[in-house]
């Protein structure tokens, strides 16, 4: 009997351990999923789908460059503890100094189990003349159709980790993507009415290739991506010479870059900088562009206004 009692205790212990190990952090357990997003854009899309069902940490601060970043001790801790990690992929956080690759490796996280690229399924555009892995243009979110892909990928992984809240996530996803889709369609109509000779988006970084393809507006830039030299005299000279051959009425400068190179271009061409726009980050809470939807609406409105001058 003593032997049987011992075996029963061991059996019960195993059952308890298995139950603890297999339990999901969902509404049933009373625990929220711990979710990490690499930047403010992905964090905002996640928040629109998950609401208060998760504990969310965004790594790269608002207004900072996600191409090359040095994670803080808090970022390392949050990543190590995370149930789910969302990153952009396509050469954003894994290009440059590869800060994200190092972060998840040190946190002992596994791709497609613990961390997921929200850009999965996007029709990738490459940097000019560099159609190869590691040379992808990462700025897919600047096409609202890709923002919808991001949202669907996020909702899919949230539902997989937290099935008890699947209906909640799917309801929010539908409402959110309908809103993005409406803005996308309205914006395409708006750009169709701008004269062809004025259609050129001029920015500091060449981040608007996805935007250009979506809304039928070519783009020009000083430098192609933030991981290369930025605003050299040769880069500025090349753009100035190009702009002198056009009738483009306005220039734009991004919120997360040094505006001095674009000011030089403006002075040399007598083309005014019409507005500051958003690429790699949303704005601070309470300011124009303080969500993914708001930053895209702001960009689309300002670019259309500037090119219609």
From Swiss-Prot:
GO terms for biological process: cell adhesion; metal ion transport. Disulfide bonds: none annotated. It is a lipid-anchor. It is found in: Cell membrane. CDD domains: PsaA. A lipid is attached at residue 20 (N-palmitoyl cysteine). It comes from the Bacteria. Pfam families: ZnuA. Residues 1-19 form the signal peptide. SUPFAM superfamilies: Helical backbone' metal receptor (SSF53807). One of its GO terms (cellular component) is plasma membrane. One of its GO terms (molecular function) is metal ion binding. Keywords: Cell membrane, Lipoprotein, Manganese, Membrane, Metal-binding, Palmitate, Signal, Transport. The keyword Chloroplast does not apply. A lipid is attached at residue 20 (S-diacylglycerol cysteine). Mn(2+) binds at residues 67, 139, 205, 280. The keyword Manganese applies. PROSITE patterns: PROKAR_LIPOPROTEIN. Belongs to the bacterial solute-binding protein 9 family. Lipoprotein receptor antigen (Lrai) subfamily. PANTHER family: HIGH-AFFINITY ZINC UPTAKE SYSTEM PROTEIN ZNUA-RELATED, METAL-BINDING PROTEIN HI_0362-RELATED. NCBIfam families: ABC_lipo_SloC. Part of the ATP-riven (ABC) transport system PsaABC involved in manganese import. Binds manganese with high affinity and specificity and delivers it to the membrane permease for translocation into the cytoplasm. Also acts as an adhesin which is involved on adherence to extracellular matrix. This is Manganese ABC transporter substrate-binding lipoprotein PsaA. It comes from Streptococcus mitis. The gene is psaA.
């Amino acid at each position: 009997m003593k032997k049987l009692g011992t075996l029963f205790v061991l059996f019960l212990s195993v059952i308890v351990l298995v139950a603890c190990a297999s339990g999901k952090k969902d509404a049933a357990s009373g625990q929220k999923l711990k979710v990490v997003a690499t930047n403010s854009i992905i964090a905002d899309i996640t928040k629109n789908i998950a609401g208060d069902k998760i504990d969310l940490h965004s790594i790269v601060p608002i207004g900072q460059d996600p191409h090359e970043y040095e994670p803080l001790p808090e970022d390392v801790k949050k990543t190590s503890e995370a149930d789910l990690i969302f990153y952009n992929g396509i050469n954003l956080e894994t290009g440059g100094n590869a800060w994200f690759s190092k972060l998840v490796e040190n946190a002992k996280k596994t791709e497609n189990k613990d961390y997921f690229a929200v850009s999965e399924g996007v029709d990738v555009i490459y940097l000019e003349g560099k159609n190869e892995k590691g040379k992808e243009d990462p700025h897919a979110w600047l096409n609202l159709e890709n923002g919808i892909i991001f949202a669907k990928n996020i909702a899919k992984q949230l539902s997989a980790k937290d099935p008890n809240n699947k209906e909640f996530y799917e309801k929010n996803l539908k409402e959110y993507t309908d809103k993005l889709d409406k803005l996308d369609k309205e914006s395409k109509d708006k750009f169709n009415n701008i004269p062809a000779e004025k259609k050129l988006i001029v920015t500091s970084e060449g981040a608007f290739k996805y935007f250009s393809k979506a809304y039928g507006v070519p783009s020009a830039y000083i430098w192609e991506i933030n991981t290369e030299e930025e605003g050299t005299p040769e880069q500025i000279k090349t753009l100035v010479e190009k702009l002198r051959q056009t009738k483009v009425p306005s220039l734009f400068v991004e919120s997360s870059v040094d505006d001095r190179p674009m000011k030089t271009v403006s002075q040399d061409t007598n083309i005014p900088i019409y507005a500051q726009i958003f690429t790699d980050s949303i704005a601070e809470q309470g300011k124009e562009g303080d969500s993914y939807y708001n930053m895209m609406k702001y960009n689309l409105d300002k670019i259309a206004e500037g090119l219609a001058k």
